[in-house]
Amino acid sequence: MLDILDCGAGERRPGPYDVTDQNDHFHWFYHRHETEDITENLTGGGHFHLFATPKFFGDILSVHYTHLIAIELDRDGGLGSFFIPNIWVTQEMPRPSGTLKAACQKFDARLNSPNMLISIWLAALTRTFLNDILKLLEQRDRFLAAMPRAERKTYFADTAISRICEWKMD
């Protein structure tokens, strides 16, 4: 997988453009953090960010995508973890987990993809691990619901917190 991506530390693929499907419903990109970024470069393999666009939700007024899941690779290119990043990381329009189920079930950015094999793999992963992804999204919702509303804005902007929740593949 890492050979296909051919992405060095600090780079983003499939540069210079990310992958957005032909219907403008789904979007993904892959990147690796700089080697010195110890908090985000734990596995050395980088990670994918998967999004649903405002168009998928019928939201023509929003310009912000909604982050579905991040998929981390280990240093050998194998599956390392799934995680939900903090809002400052993705600058997204967060939505409750219940509204994201359909997007996770239907995620497919194969049309118009310069990286067809990877797009197929990502679609298969979201279906194979659908229940686990939904559990992470629900965990995020429970965590945030327990947090006083007045503290959320500060939490979302705290650059020391890059991941809200994570499931590591052991």
Give the role of each language-model region.
Residues 14-82:
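Aromatic- and glycine-enriched beta-alpha-beta binding-site module
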Residues 78-170:
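Mixed-charge (acidic/basic) macromolecular-recognition segments
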